[in-house]
Amino acid sequence: MKMETLKQQILTAKGDVRAELVLKNARVINVFTNEIEQADVAICQGIILGVGHYTGETELDLQGKYVCPGLVDGHIHIESSMLCGPAFEQAVLPHGTTAVVTDPHEISNVAGTAGLDFMLETTKDLALSVYFMLPSCVPATGLDESGAVLEAEQLRPYYQQPRVLGLAELMNSYGTVRADEKILQKIRDCTAAGKKIDGHAPFLSGEELNAYVTAGVQSDHECSDVREAMEKLRRGQYIMVREGTAAQNMDSLLPLFREPYCSRCMLVTDDKHPGDLLQGGHIDYIIRKAIAAGVDPVVAVRMGTLVPCQYFGLAHSGAVAPGYTADLIVLSDLEKFTVEQVYKKGKLVAQQGKMLHPAALAVDKARFARVFDSFNMDEITPEQLQLKQTGTRQRVICLTPHSLLTTEKIVPFCQHPGTAPGVDVTQQIVKLAVFERHHRSGHVGLGFLGNYGLQCGAVASSIAHDSHNLIVAGTNDADMVLAGNTVRKNKGGLAFALNGQVVGELPLPVAGLMSTESAEAVEEKLQALKAALKAHGISEDIDAFMTLAFVSLPVIPKLRLNTYGIVDVDAQRIVPAVF
C-alpha cells in the first residue's frame, strides 16, 4: 500500500475526511463481541474504515437495518450445483454469500488438471470470491476407477496460486493413518506451502484419530453426531457443520452452536442442488434454520463468517470492523435473516434477490476439450447387465434418509416376473449398475439398492462420486440400457426412462457434471425429472439424483458400488452381490 493511501485511510477513519460511502443508522452485527451495535459504517476503496459516526460522499440511511459480514461457505463442491461459475454466482451471491472455498475434486476426477484449470479460469473474474482446496484423493481410493490420477507432483505447482488455500478433504483416512507415502507427500507439500489440510473421516476415533490429526489434518465435515464432533474438537480440529441437499447434520450438532465450541465450528453445504440454492438459500438458509432452533443469531452469523475466515487465514475478512474488506450484507430482519442488499468490496452487487450485473460464461472450448468431451465408452448393451454371480442370497446397499451413510441388508435372492433378477419393488429393492466411462475399459459393477423407492423404469446419472462413472438404477434391464445410453449421447447428465421411452433428461456437457445454462433453466429440467420420479415411487425422504450420486463413493460406510463391484468400505474389499 502506498504511503498516501494509508494516510488517507487513517484520516478517513478519524473522521477528518469524508468516506466514499457511509451506511448510516445501521445495527452492526459484531462477531468479535457477540453483540449488535447502533452505528454507521464508513467505506473507502473497498475497505471498511470505521464503525461509529461518519459522513460520506454517498450516504445510505438504513433506518435500523442490520449490517452483517458477507457469508462464507467453508466447504463446497461447485460442480454439485450442476452450474458453472457464473451461474453458481448468480444463485448464491443474492443470498449473501460473498466467498466460497471449493474443492474441485469432482471435475478433477473426470479431467485431471484440465478440470482444475477450467474451474480456476471460469471463476477468476467473478464478484464472488472463489477460493480452492486442491483435491487430495483423485481417485478417492485405490478401489475406484477415475478419469485421472493426481499425485503430489501434479498438485505441487498449484500452491503458488493465491486463491489456493490448501489440500482438500483427505478422504483416504485409511491410507493416511497407515502412513501411505503417496498421501504423506501431498501432506508435506501442503504443509511446506503453509496452507491448510481439510479432513473427511466419518467415525474416526481414538488412536487412529490421533494419528490423522498428527499427520496435519485440521478440520472435518463428516460428523453426524455431537459425540463424534466433540472428540474431534478435543483433538484440535475445526468442525464444519454441514447442511446440504443430501447430507444434513445441523440438527444433530446443535449443541455446538454455543461457547466455547462455536469459535471452532463453521457452516458449510458440501453439496447443494440448484433448486435448493434458488429457493431455500445457501449459508443464509443454515443461519435461518439455526435461529429458528433457538441459536443466538450472532453466534450463527459468526459461524458463517468470521470462523471460516480465521480458519483459512483470509486476513481482514469475515467481520464488520476497521481495516476489513467491505464484503457486507444488509438484512431487513435478523430473525428471518432476510438478505436485502449485498456489497462486495464496497460495491452494491445484489439487491432484493437479484444480481445487478451478472457475468456470462466465457470459455475456450478448444482449450478445455477434455472437459467438454469427457465420455469415452461404448454403447451399453443388455449383456453388460447380466449377473455373473449365482447363489440363493443377495446383498443390498440400503439408503438412509437425509444421510450419506448406507447399511447392509442380506435377503433371499428375488425373482419376479416383469423385473430384472434380484429386483423386488415391494421391498424397495432395485438393480444397480456402474459403467466405467473414462477409458473404454468396459468394466461394469452390478448390485442392488434398497430404500430408493423406484417402482418402475430406470434412472441414469453421470454424476457418481467421486470418479463420476455412469450410475444406473432400475427395475428392468431394457430401461436401464436406454437411460444409460441417453446420458452417454448427451455427453453427460441425468435421464429417466420408462417403458422404453425417455421421460426426461438433463444434459450436463461440462465433464458430465455441469450445465452451461442458468440455475433457473437447470432447475426447471431437474424438477420435471424429480416430479416424474416421485410419481413412480421415489420417496420424499430421498433426493433422487444427489443421493444416487453418492452410492458409488467408496469412502463413506457401509457399502458402495463402483465399476469393480460392491465395496465394503470398512474392510476396503469387494464383496459379492449374490452368494
Regions found by a protein language model. Give the residues of each.
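Active-site beta-loop-alpha junctions enriched in small/polar residues
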Residues: 77-79, 105-107, 135-140, 170-173, ...
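Histidine/acidic residue-rich metal-binding segments in metalloenzymes
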Residues: 149-169, 175-240, 247-268, 278-292, ...
